[in-house]
A protein has these predicted regions:
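Catalytic domains of carbohydrate-active enzymes that cleave complex glycans
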Residues: 402, 411-427
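Glycan-recognition and catalytic regions of carbohydrate-active enzymes
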Residues: 428-454
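Short, well-ordered beta-strand segments enriched in hydrophobic/aromatic residues
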Residues: 18-22
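Short, small-residue-biased leader/transition segments that mark boundaries at the very start
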Residues: 3-8, 452-455
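Conserved structural scaffold segments of CAZyme catalytic domains across common CAZy folds
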Residues: 24, 38-264
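Aromatic- and carboxylate-enriched substrate-binding clefts and catalytic-loop regions
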Residues: 236-408
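Short loop/turn motifs at secondary-structure junctions
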Residues: 3, 228-230, 292-293
């Protein structure tokens, strides 16, 4: 058979993109690297999410630093998306789309207005870091970035080109270029709000039971969700017998009873899992959740961007879809079209979100204002807004157990209008929302699914 390699270029009203397609005799090929160089004009300004981990072990939760392109050096890795403003005012977002069976793209600079591509290598061997149940050490890495099919299309390299910042928010080129859905059976997929337990550390009060990870507390969450028309509640870390034993709940939790109780009130349950144990028995674990009547999973702490991890995301999307389960990828890289191919994939974190108000001052209104023009351009973003208690910069303090947000309550409400996520969290305690009924009523009524996007 004739061997072919082609470069496909496309131009759109909202940008330009290219990808490679191969038709090779070998069923499997090794990709040593992919060369990407972008030469930009002097004076371009960037919002640069600098990745300091040189092994690409990252949650993709950086601050977007405002830099001149000429200040970038080889050791300053940045992950996508990257926002660039030219001296003439054109706004460009650098992204990729249709990322499957291939590592994520990172960029570096050279102090000469050139951006160059880098990729995480194939991970041959890894292990858990001593003393942790989730952080990995990469023990052996290949000299290549992928082993893949000889006949295939590679990811799109995308420049989203916009006349102004308004057009940046409306640009959906990444979604346009992504592969179509693998299924037409989507009626069961229900976007919605989700009441979250972790941010508030289950601090409910004024109740006649002991608050904690137990059936009564989650019934309280279900009652709150039902009252405000919130479709789901999330049982985050702590519900299972162990972080690596995610096939059974702790004795204090009666999952079948919670599913029954929620079903009567039109509230579904979503369960948190670490990625590692899920990876080791994906089908078996999801079979259990399907049998229990669970509506979705939040998969957490992937922290990698290599080929194996990209394939893990797709495996989860497919296995969950086969069992009519929704998926929220937390501790993740950015979306690049997976949610189009598997429409049960509802949202991705890959952002420095509200959860870090528990340990940092970096999550402030300026940071939040940058996100719609940077991270959110890639796709749905699990920022987890909804703080009831708020403070200005002068009065803000860090409190992990009783967290507050930096900014106003009106700012928190506005995030529900601006931020896109098909599973949009209400991060705070139901008890706090009951004390702020106007706020709870307003944010719970803002839709999460749209037919058109306007800025």
């Amino acid at each position: 058979r004739r061997q072919r390699q082609m470069c496909i270029r496309d131009r759109y009203n909202n940008g330009a993109a290219y990808r490679f397609e191969t038709s090779l005799k070998q069923p499997k090929v090794i990709i040593n690297t992919e060369t990407i160089e972008q030469n930009w004009t002097e004076g371009c300004k960037l919002y640069w999410p600098r990745e300091k981990n040189q092994e690409y072990l990252t949650h993709c939760e950086a601050i977007f630093d405002e830099l001149n392109i000429s200040s970038l050096t080889k050791d300053m890795k940045g992950y996508l998306p990257i926002y660039l403003s030219t001296p003439k005012g054109t706004k460009v977002v650098i992204m990729e789309s249709d990322l499957f069976d291939y590592p994520n793209l990172f960029l570096t600079g050279d102090r000469n207005n050139t951006l160059s591509g880098e990729f995480p290598p194939v991970v041959l061997k890894s292990a858990l870091k001593e003393g942790t149940d989730r952080d990995e050490v990469l023990l052996e890495k290949a000299s290549y970035i992928a082993e893949t099919e000889g006949t295939r299309a590679f990811p799109w390299r995308v420049l989203m080109i916009n006349e102004d910042d308004k057009a940046v928010i409306e640009n959906n080129l990444v979604y346009q270029l992504a592969s179509p859905s693998v299924t037409q059976d989507t009626e069961w997929i229900k976007p919605g709000k989700i009441s979250w337990d972790w941010w508030s550390t289950l601090n409910v009060y004024g109740v006649d039971f002991k608050a904690g990870v137990n059936t009564d507390t989650y019934k309280y969450f279900i009652d709150f969700a039902s009252k405000y028309g919130i479709e789901y509640i999330l049982l985050d870390e702590g519900w299972s017998a162990g972080t690596w034993n995610i096939k059974e709940a702790i004795p204090e939790l009666n999952i079948p009873e919670l599913v029954r109780y929620g079903k009567e009130r039109n509230v579904g349950l979503v369960l948190w899992t670490l990625w590692n144990p899920l990876d080791k028995d994906l089908e078996g674990i999801l079979d259990i959740y399907e049998k229990w009547g669970i509506k979705g999973i939040k998969v957490d702490f992937m922290q990698r961007s290599d080929q194996y991890m990209v394939n893990f995301y797709e495996r989860v999307g497919k296995a969950a879809m086969d069992r009519k389960l929704l998926v929220d990828f937390h501790g993740s890289f950015k979306p690049s079209g997976l949610q189009k191919r598997y429409p049960n994939v509802m949202t991705f974190e890959g952002v420095l979100g509200l959860e870090h108000d528990k340990d940092s001052r970096d999550i402030n209104p300026v940071h939040d204002l940058i996100l719609p023009f940077t991270r959110m351009v890639a796709g749905p973003m699990d920022y987890t807004p909804g703080a009831v208690n708020n403070a200005t910069a002068e009065d803000f303090y860090i409190n992990f157990v009783h967290p507050i947000s930096l900014g106003t309550r009106a700012h928190q409400a506005a995030l529900y209008v601006v931020y896109e996520s098909s599973l949009q969290m209400l991060a705070d305690s139901p008890s706090n929302y009951y004390k702020a009924p106007e706020f709870a009523s307003f944010i719970s009524r803002i839709p999460v699914a749209y037919t058109h996007l306007r800025a």
